[in-house]
């Protein structure tokens, strides 16, 4: 809603190159970049980047957590001081990483108020800049469940704000956003039982976050 020409590409299933010929000089690209892709970047320089968390994953390729972390942090490799990196304050690895990088760091937290950054205060998500406190949205207005999704909203809102999107557009977008397929995706309700598809929860951390998002007794139906 905030821009005429926006492309959502990358590790979500739409190759960046498949849309490159459609892009204009004023186009905005929202890209999910995998650790596999970050291994070989040379000139890639996002105006706004983010790392949401560091959890054990892809060790069949990276072999150690130290190497996996090193590769994930390459997203800021070419960023300058006028660029922005959004990081999870509650992730100790990312909090320390943010102390020693070139771009402006904006932290998010669902557990505490921050002197600067975006955080959850009661049921209100607030962005605090050097100059003001900006209410973004109340969690009750969101259509997605769970504290981890509140954190996702914080990260997305911060990225959009520092990319020049208005607070009004951010509020409208996060209120309208529904769960992406296979991630705590509402299916139906039968006989008072709500069914959710969370089949993308393929590592322990993702599965735990899905369970924590439920506010009623929960039964898991899993494949083998």
PLM-predicted stretches and their roles:
Residues 1-9:
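Walker A (P-loop) phosphate-binding motif
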Residues 4, 13-26:
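P-loop NTPase switch/communication element
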Residues 5-6, 26-27, 80-85, 192-195, ...:
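Short active-site oxyanion
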Residues 11, 110, 223-224:
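Cofactor-binding loop segments of dinucleotide-utilizing enzymes, especially the Rossmann-like FAD-
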Residues 12-16, 35-37, 92, 179:
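Short acidic loop-to-helix transition motifs that present clustered carboxylates
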Residues 14-17, 33, 203-207:
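Short glycine/serine/threonine-rich phosphate/pyrophosphate-binding segments
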Residues 22-114, 119-121, 126, 133, ...:
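Flexible active-site lid/hinge loop adjacent to a nucleotide/diphosphate
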Residues 139-224:
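Nucleotide phosphate-binding/pyrophosphate-handling subdomain across enzymes
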């Amino acid at each position: 809603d905030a821009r005429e020409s926006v492309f959502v590409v990358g590790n979500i299933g739409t190759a960046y190159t498949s849309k490159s010929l459609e892009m204009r000089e004023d186009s905005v690209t929202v890209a999910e970049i995998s650790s596999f892709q970050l291994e070989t970047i040379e000139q890639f320089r996002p105006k706004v980047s983010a790392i949401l968390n560091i959890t054990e994953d892809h060790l069949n390729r990276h072999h150690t957590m130290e190497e996996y972390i090193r590769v994930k942090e390459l997203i800021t490799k070419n960023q300058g001081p006028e660029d922005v990196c959004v990081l999870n304050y509650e992730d100790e690895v990312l909090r320390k990483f943010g102390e020693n990088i070139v771009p402006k760091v904006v932290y998010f937290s669902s557990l505490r108020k921050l002197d600067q950054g975006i955080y959850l205060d009661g049921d209100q998500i607030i962005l605090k800049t050097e100059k003001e406190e900006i209410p973004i949205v109340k969690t009750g207005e969101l259509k997605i469940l769970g504290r981890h999704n509140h954190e996702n909203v914080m990260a997305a809102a911060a990225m959009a704000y520092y990319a020049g999107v208005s607070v009004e557009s951010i509020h409208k977008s996060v209120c309208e956003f529904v769960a992406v397929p296979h991630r705590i995706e509402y299916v139906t309700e039968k006989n008072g039982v709500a069914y959710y598809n969370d089949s993308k929860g393929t590592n322990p951390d993702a599965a735990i976050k899905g369970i924590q998002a439920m506010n009623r007794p929960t039964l898991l139906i899993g494949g083998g």
